[in-house]
Swiss-Prot record:
Chain's gene name: luxB
InterPro entries in the cross-refs: Alkanal_monooxygenase, Bact_Lucif_Oxidored, Bacterial_luciferase_CS, Luciferase-like_dom, Luciferase-like_sf, Luciferase_bac/NFP
Source organism superkingdom: Bacteria
Biological processes per GO annotation: bioluminescence
Function: Light-emitting reaction in luminous bacteria. The specific role of the beta subunit is unknown, but it is absolutely required for bioluminescence activity.
EC number: 1.14.14.3
Assembly behavior: Heterodimer of an alpha and a beta chain.
Name of protein: Alkanal monooxygenase beta chain
Keywords: Flavoprotein, FMN, Luminescence, Monooxygenase, Oxidoreductase, Photoprotein
Length: 326
């Protein structure tokens, strides 16, 4: 099991954007130190609201890669459906070269209809657009060149510069059953959405296994990623209240057709690492097992006391270290 961090960068009431970004930078600088054992940090993409203030994660990632020396830095959900794949390929090659292979590319279809509309993409062909973007991008990353002649792109063979110097690790956000099935056919690892229920994540995993088997894909070395919100407090009520306050607006925005947002929020609180220190381990290990995950990504952003965040990161780091020694 590998451990990492992910950042949603929500801007709650009472916090400035500078405060949100400084918290991310300070935390990343901490876990990059030699005596910390977190493998990677991933940054989320989100547009047009304070439920995630980084609309261009690769820009933030370039800063964090320059800030750090050891840890991998990457995107949690770089949306390719609303971006030009050649541009993402160029950015990826640059980040791969300048970080000496520490960049991780987490890709996503668009999960919000309002983003598809704003960027003038047709919802009716969304899956096809996503797949077309990926094929161009992957060709650029694996061969250093790409070309296209399909319903969405048409351009001659070009060199995508600078060329990647390593095999950039890719993950696909489990944004829909169609995307999960497509990823399974290609043997690409998933990153589950933190805001999906465990039942939804498990359903995706079981479908992934079935499709992979149908296509003779060996899943033994596929390392899915499980994102976990963490808020540990001696006062269980404080932990739950902080998480509820932190995620309520995003969940309402992300699941507009859900008839009972309050129930979904409470279910998420139960399924993430929220509460006292002895309340999260068994449920977390169960969730990791039933989703086939080999990477556990942690977010401490809902915690308001930053000294407590540091203490909790140190606690997790010691547990990781102890396990490595064993």
């Amino acid at each position: 099991m590998n451990f990492g961090l992910f950042f949603l960068n929500f801007q709650p009431e009472g916090m400035t954007s500078e405060m949100v970004l400084d918290n991310m930078v300070d935390t990343v600088a901490l876990v990059d130190k030699d005596d910390y054992h977190f493998k990677r940090v991933l940054v989320s993409e989100h547009h047009f609201s304070k439920n995630g203030i980084i609309g261009e994660p690769l820009t933030a990632i370039s800063f964090l890669l320059g800030l750090t020396k050891r840890i991998e830095i990457g995107s949690l959900n770089q949306v390719i459906t609303t971006h030009h794949p050649v541009r993402i390929g160029e950015q990826t090659g640059l980040l791969d070269q300048m970080s000496y292979g520490r960049f991780v590319l987490g890709l996503s279809d668009c999960v919000n209809d309002f983003e598809m509309d704003f960027f003038k993409r047709k919802r009716s062909s969304q899956q096809q657009q996503f797949e077309a973007c990926y094929e161009i991008l992957n060709e650029a990353l694996t061969t250093n060149y790409c070309q296209a002649d399909d319903d969405f792109f048409n351009f001659p063979r070009i060199s995508v510069n600078p060329h990647c110097i390593s095999e950039v690790k890719q993950y696909i956000l489990a944004s829909s059953m169609g995307v999960v099935e497509w990823a399974a056919r290609k043997g690409l690892p998933l990153t589950y959405r933190w805001s999906d229920s465990l039942a939804e994540k498990e359903k995706y995993y079981q479908r992934y296994l079935a499709v992979a088997k149908e296509n003779n894909i060996d899943v033994s070395n596929i390392d899915h990623q499980f994102p976990l919100l963490v808020n540990i407090n001696e006062n269980r009520r404080i932990a739950r209240d902080e998480v509820r306050e932190y995620i309520q607006s995003y969940v309402s925005e992300a699941y507009p057709t859900d008839p009972n947002i309050e129930l979904r929020v409470e279910e998420l609180i139960e399924q993430h690492a929220v509460g006292k220190v002895d309340e999260y381990y068994d449920s977390t290990m169960h969730a990791v097992k039933v989703t086939g995950s080999k990477n556990l990504l942690l977010s401490f952003e809902s915690m308001k006391n930053k000294d407590d965040v540091t203490k909790l990161i140190n606690m997790f780091n010691q547990k990781i270290k102890d396990n490595l020694i064993k």
